[in-house]
């Protein structure tokens, strides 16, 4: 990761959980020993056909034994220290809208019921200290009351009942504080389905204001970013979230334009494929919802744990693992389109965020196929090298982090935009067609004079035949750049102090 050029590592949930995705938290206070450290173990796997998890002795030992939990927290502490030593930062995933049915507060699986040192869960007993943490529809079903509210009716994801429990609010605020404080010292939180927390918009805002206050008092530099679909303006007023995962003003417009695919690979739309007018319109509309600080810090992703891999979307195949099969996700993919997307990602306003494996050519339909293991020893080395080079360009030119944005040219399957300041310009040109063509770009919109000639240096070009950083000069005459663009091509040009960034 350090060699790739990563500055921040955002970890999907790492707390105790029975699943591989871990968005069904079992214990917010401890790192899962299965990805941490197991120092005490025992026999006792479930027998074939046995669905009673209270019989899973081996699992119960691993996730309830304090020695395993403490050792795992210690290992995580050491990991964060090493990440910081290498000049990188760490963001944790906070799943606070709901927990899992395995959670010690609920204990539907009766894992904690007979374990020393644990209170009875709210599912198990009406006298549980955690009863108010959840909303039970029928008060007459204890012991083992299954009538609790589930997020989107999922009984494996009990929704947390904040409005009725001051103790729950206090507990989650302590969790938020704990992990950004010594000895763990993480650098911020990504908040899962943040707008869903609570049962009213009013309470939701009140809680996140308090969360921000507690977290920032513990760590003034901690970032707070949220998963959110739709307009986030009311949460971005400076007292709740810092920014968001940028679906509306990045992932969706980019994937529709370059691939015509919906981000789960559930739909193909010919009317949006290559439609640069729709791309520009969507970007302008949704970027207005983000103030400058939120926009420049927004997580610009091509793929993530909830959606299909971008490289898979380049095959224009509607499908899911359940009926299309894993091999279909990598059939007829187009790495050149992936490189176009990576260039946009690394030159667009915001924080480019690479989902593990995208840089190595990993394919996959939506969850769970998008969570394949990293292909150690089988990486697409060309894609990996391209990511390294584009990350290097992103970090080398401050324009790409702070510069203004202007659209310069567009047509069907074609787009150009500029990032610029008073004395420097970067121009990106894309041709998403399967054949080469000439384009004329209005470079003057970035501040280049229309009265003479301006020399732009090419710093990256990619096409269906590969890519290169080999320098080549392009002259803008009277503020117009004329460029021959290759098939499935993208070019990055720079004008300014010629040797400034060497």
Regions found by a protein language model. Give the residues of each.
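Conserved alpha/beta catalytic core and glycan-binding cleft of carbohydrate-active enzymes
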Residues: 102, 208, 212-213, 221-368, ...
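Short, flexible loop/turn elements at secondary-structure junctions
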Residues: 15, 32, 96, 164, ...
């Amino acid at each position: 990761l350090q060699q790739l050029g990563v500055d921040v590592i955002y970890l999907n949930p790492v707390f105790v959980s029975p699943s591989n995705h871990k968005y069904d938290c079992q214990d917010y206070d401890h790192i899962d020993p299965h990805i941490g450290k197991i120092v005490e173990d025992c026999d006792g796997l479930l027998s074939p056909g046995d669905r009673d998890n209270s019989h899973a002795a081996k699992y119960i030992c691993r996730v309830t034994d304090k020695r395993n939990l403490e050792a795992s927290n210690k290992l995580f502490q050491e990991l964060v220290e090493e990440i910081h030593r290498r000049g990188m930062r760490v963001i944790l995933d906070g799943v606070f809208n709901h927990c899992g049915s395995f959670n010690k507060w609920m204990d539907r699986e009766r894992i904690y019921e007979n374990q020393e040192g644990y209170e009875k869960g709210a599912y198990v007993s009406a006298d549980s200290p955690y009863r108010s943490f959840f909303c039970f529809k029928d008060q007459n079903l204890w012991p083992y009351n299954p009538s609790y509210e589930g997020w989107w009716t999922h009984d494996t994801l009990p929704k947390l009942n904040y409005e009725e429990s001051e103790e729950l609010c206090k507990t989650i605020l302590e969790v938020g504080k704990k992990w950004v404080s010594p000895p763990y010292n993480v650098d911020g939180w990504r908040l899962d389905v943040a707008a869903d927390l609570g049962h009213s918009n009013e309470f939701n805002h009140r809680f996140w204001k308090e969360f921000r206050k507690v977290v920032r008092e513990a760590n003034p530099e901690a970032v707070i970013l949220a998963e959110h679909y739709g307009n986030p303006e009311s949460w971005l007023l400076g007292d709740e979230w810092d920014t968001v995962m940028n679906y509306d003003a990045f992932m969706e417009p980019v994937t529709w334009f370059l691939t015509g695919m919906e981000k789960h690979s559930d739909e193909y739309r010919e009317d949006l494929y290559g439609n640069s007018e729709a791309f520009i319109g969507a970007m302008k509309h949704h970027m207005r919802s983000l103030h400058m600080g939120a926009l420049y810090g927004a997580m610009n992703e091509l793929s993530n744990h909830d959606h299909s891999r971008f490289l898979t979307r380049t095959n224009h195949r509607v499908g899911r693992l359940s009926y299309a099969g894993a091999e279909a996700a990598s059939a007829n993919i187009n790495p050149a389109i992936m490189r176009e997307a990576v260039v946009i990602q690394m030159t667009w306003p915001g924080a480019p965020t690479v989902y593990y494996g995208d840089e190595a050519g990993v394919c996959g339909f939506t969850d769970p196929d998008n969570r394949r293991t990293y292909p150690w020893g089988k990486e697409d080395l060309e894609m990996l090298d391209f990511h390294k080079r584009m990350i290097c360009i992103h970090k080398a030119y401050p324009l790409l982090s702070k510069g203004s944005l202007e659209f310069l040219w567009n047509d069907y399957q074609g787009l150009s935009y500029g990032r610029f300041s008073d004395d420097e310009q970067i121009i990106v040109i894309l041709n998403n067609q399967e054949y080469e063509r000439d384009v004329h770009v209005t470079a003057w919109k970035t501040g280049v004079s229309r009265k003479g000639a301006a020399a732009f240096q090419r710093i990256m070009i990619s096409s269906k035949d590969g890519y290169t950083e080999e320098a080549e000069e392009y002259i803008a005459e009277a503020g117009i750049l004329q460029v021959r663009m290759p098939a499935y091509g993208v070019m990055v040009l720079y004008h300014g102090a010629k040797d400034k960034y060497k």
